[in-house]
Amino acid sequence: MAAPYDVQQVEAYWRHRWETEGVGRVDLDAVDPSDVFVNLVEYPYPSAEGLHVGHVYRYAGVDAYGRYQRMSGTQVFQPIGFDAFGIHTENYALSVGEHPVSLTARTTARFSRQLSRIGCAWDWTRVIDTSRPDYYRWTQWILVRLFEAGLLYRAEAPVIWCPSCLTVLAREQTERDGTVCERCESPVIEKVMTQWFLRMTDYADRLLAGLDDLDWPERAKRLQRQWIGRSEGTEIAFGDLIVFTTRPDTLPAVTFLAVPPGHPAAGGARPHPMTGAEIPVFEADYVVEAYGTGAVMGVPAHDERDRRFAMAQGIATSHAELLDPQAAAAVGAPAVRYRLRDWLISRQRYWGPPIPIIHCAACGPVAVPDDRLPVLLPEIEDFRPAGTGESPLASVHDWVATTCPSCNGPARRETDVSDTFVDSAWYFLRYPSTEFDDRPWDADRTAKVLPVDFYAGGPEHVQRHHLYARFMTMALHDLGLVPFEEPFPRIRIGGLIVKDGAKMSKSRGNVVTPDDYVGTVGADALRCGLLFSAPWEQGGEFTDAAIAGIERFFAKTRRVITGPDREGPHERTLGRSIHAVTDAIERFTFNVAIARLMELLPEVGSADSKRIFVRLLAPFAPHLAEELWHRLGEPFSVHTQPWPQSAASSDDELVDIAVQVDGKLRGSITVPRDASERNTCEVARREVSAVPAVATRVVYVPGRVVNFVTGGR
């Protein structure tokens, strides 16, 4: 009979021992640069009462990968922190009637407890909190450097305003073609305001070109390319109205011009550059002022959208002959345009780092000197957004009034704060240097440890945080402040875990907290239950049935590992399993790795196979593996042991199988060469979402293809 296993006691004991003995921590001064592996996941917003299991799904996968890397011989640096400043936390504070200062202290403490209890190998000695002065001092320092370089500027421009959040938004913070706020989903409006921008468009070509060399999912790279939106075309003058087009050959068929709502040319007319005929100018919602020149040609004969608009407005259609390439090239000037706009970073809110600029009537905008940083955020009782276009800080008159650093004359502080995405655009640079209070990052430490070797994030950040961080790193590199241009050479995007068929959210009432499970079945069961639910990059449905299945697997594991030794498994079987688990981890199909462990367990009998099995289990169930390693009489810790190796060739043992549904290719899987039809079908159902749970029949060609026939067409 297996020894009793008190999951709460066991997990608490090993977590305490890992922390006190520094398992997983890296001496960044002593480590060889070739050995260090930075394993980073996007830090959370502490803008709720705690984590939900969707967070655990993402973190557990990253932690499993980090533990595998450590056992494979690298020195894994895996820090964590809190994206505590910004609208997410402030809106939550407003909703619960608590000041952001006290709320952030409370929520980060709770998040820390939860992050610790799920068993991830965080380096708790290097936690960052973006709302602390020792962090945002350096956010402000970076903005000063960018201001001095001409990359931070203030200008009047049409901006996106959220009437609900009562602040401007960057275009990247809108959804549904720029019509709603990504945070509150309220319709947004356009205003003309004076705001602070970063010259991200100066880096458009480099941001595009750099994507080619990054190990990112193709979809993520495609989304960034689309967002940057480089177009080569022609600028054509209709009088004083300049139009950008990629189809200059259609110029003879132009019957109207379209501009965005509110454009001063709307309602007038402009001369056709070829005929001199007056072409009417219409307002059209589909024209984006920030793209091209803000005016487009209307060619109903050659564009379906233009045709529909012309019919609605009663505009004639011309079927004039298209220009030949030579004539088309002569009608205007070649031009390159981008969808990307400069990054609007100022916010009319309270909870953020004050932008470190002083306004002087004589000197203009002046950067706050380094020795006066940080510009501390004053604690005010009424932090609600005013909705007037000014931050609540504008009402703190004693704080606003100051002297000019250049002429010592009377001046006033900038009252806008910088957006939370400025904080996260550089946070990875701070992690290795948290002990330095006289610099944002140590040059030698940064060159040794960074860039990030592996970064995991969510799909919602591909066109926001990931893009901003790339721009920021390139800009800092150009200023000679960091030795690399790309912060995240390798990224993987975690899928979403859903409950009751929908993404977890408080509004849907389907949020599941990890505490509900860690306090009963334990962190290991929750981690493995989540990772077993679906391929990590794909995501899937979270069910209690998966947790129950993992509990049964764990109980059997304890019986086998602590039971008497016996023969087995065959060396080839063990070798195939090592290869399969290793390959699955490398592919981030942790569900396949756990399934392979389940298949291997009944074969485990010898003392050597038990030690190998426990090491294979360690990345997924770290507490259980540590306890079983201890019960086998092995030295602490299993997580510092070498990853199991096999002499067999993985090329000989594994094959790729095409997965079809009704004869159409839906994906592929990797299985052992001698996998049975049943096991192959199980892997296909887990890994390929299009595979039905029930099929009329299955056609299986060993080593080549499996086709699920549903009878549909």
Language-model features, listed with the residues they occupy:
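Structured ligand/cofactor/substrate-binding pocket environments in proteins
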Residues: 54-66, 83, 135-138, 154-155, ...
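Active-site-adjacent bridging/hinge elements
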Residues: 33-41, 115-119, 277-287, 428-450, ...
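Short Cys/His-rich metal-coordination motifs, predominantly Zn2+-binding knuckles/fingers
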Residues: 165, 182-186, 275, 361-363, ...
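N-terminal, positively charged nucleic-acid-binding surface of large information/translation enzymes
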Residues: 1-260, 300, 312, 472, ...
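Helix-rich, typically C-terminal accessory recognition domains appended to large enzymatic cores
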Residues: 144, 148-165, 238, 245, ...
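Amphipathic alpha-helical
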Residues: 200-231, 252-266, 371-403, 613-642
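Basic, alpha-helical terminal appendages of large translation-related enzymes
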Residues: 1-34, 296, 316-322, 331, ...
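Conserved phosphate-binding loops in nucleotide/dinucleotide-binding enzymes
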Residues: 94-95, 102-103, 170-201, 243-244, ...
